[in-house]
């Protein structure tokens, strides 16, 4: 089983065998040997050797290969979407949009590099001031399972454009998607060693994160793991660290004329991708009184009709399975803990089969829970909080250590102006789902949601460092000398 990609060749790992499973059927989706510490060392060494040649390539030459990658992704959209659906449980309709986003990332990343970094010149009296950007060197990219193609791609593409070389460690829950993606890079003509793939579980990740020859680490995943990485690199200022983590995101419902539109956007916010987006709404603030009652009744009615099915079902479901049977069980357990603390289930979550990742979209009223835990439950578990005043809703929405996304559904533009001034989050939407984001804008949050904006348009900032120069084409003695100098 040759499932590692090192120095331009597919090779076998020397670590333990592990497998990924289709969470909708429990069938094995991928199996192979993991990368040992020695394998990781070979991958980093390969990336280090390749760096000089890759970074010396003309920018347009690097971009030509990356554009070829995008074209091949489009050609292979169905095959890669199937790989994504098989390993993650994500319905095919949604997996196809992920592949399209991967291809679109290339053009956006080239534009971002030129705008955010690139080269700038300004004339001076005796020469020119030049700002250039240099690649860091070897960067490690850690990918998540919820978007195993798109999210690591969002770091790999800008890193390569800038001239870095990459060692990619995907989620152990989606190694097959990583393999399919790297095969496309190989066919696109990427030189040997520029991109290396190390498959594995926790030990592989530790070996890569601890390697002394990496110059940067780009991580997308849980806040707990990201916080550990932040502590680990706290004494190493020479490492560029990009952390894109989770959120306990609020969606505030104001009075609206079109209740069905509000319910639709709430369902998209809470349950899209089976709630496995870091920008999904976890806490939904609903006003007390008659309007709030009508909204909640309609939200419950539509949610109760949502079905979950296997990724390639016909007709396609709105939701697939969550990533694993274990993840499904953890969500049901989280609901139980909330109920023990005083939450009232409106639609209770159940796990369809203990071997599978199927859970239903659930709604629990946590208004009466004192000291509501500030936790991200990564799945379709919506927590309802009834509020008396708009300012009370904003105050409670801000009562979190996270700050990734937030949203307001309201007809009142003055309410929106007040909301965006006072809410604390990196992505703040009005009359759009909380998980609506543009790749042409920076992506990231405040607090425990990450460090600055490591994804989307501002990813370019993490992929190259500025080098300032003052230059003159001719060496000349100044016409005016400093006091005390005699020539």
UniProtKB/Swiss-Prot annotation:
- MF terms (GO), sorted A to Z: succinylglutamate-semialdehyde dehydrogenase activity
Q: What class of enzyme is it?
A: oxidoreductase
Pathway listed: Amino-acid degradation; L-arginine degradation via AST pathway; L-glutamate and succinate from L-arginine: step 4/5
Q: Where does NAD(+) bind?
A: 221-226
Give me the reactions it catalyses. N-succinyl-L-glutamate 5-semialdehyde + NAD(+) + H2O = N-succinyl-L-glutamate + NADH + 2 H(+)
Q: What is its EC number?
A: 1.2.1.71
Q: Which InterPro entries match?
A: Ald_DH/histidinol_DH (IPR016161), Ald_DH_C (IPR016163), Ald_DH_CS_CYS (IPR016160), Ald_DH_CS_GLU (IPR029510), Ald_DH_N (IPR016162), Aldehyde_DH_dom (IPR015590), SuccinylGlu_semiald_DH_AstD (IPR017649)
- List of catalytic residues: 244, 278
Instruction: Please provide the Gene Ontology terms (biological process) for this protein.
Output: arginine catabolic process to glutamate; arginine catabolic process to succinate
**SUPFAM superfamilies, per the entry:** ALDH-like (SSF53720)
Q: Name one Pfam family in it.
A: Aldedh
Keywords on this record? Arginine metabolism, NAD, Oxidoreductase
What's this chain's function? Catalyzes the NAD-dependent reduction of succinylglutamate semialdehyde into succinylglutamate.
Family classification: Belongs to the aldehyde dehydrogenase family. AstD subfamily.
NCBIfam families xrefs: arg_catab_astD, PRK09457.1
The protein's name is N-succinylglutamate 5-semialdehyde dehydrogenase
Organism of derivation: Burkholderia orbicola (strain MC0-3)
Task: Identify the gene encoding this protein.
Answer: astD
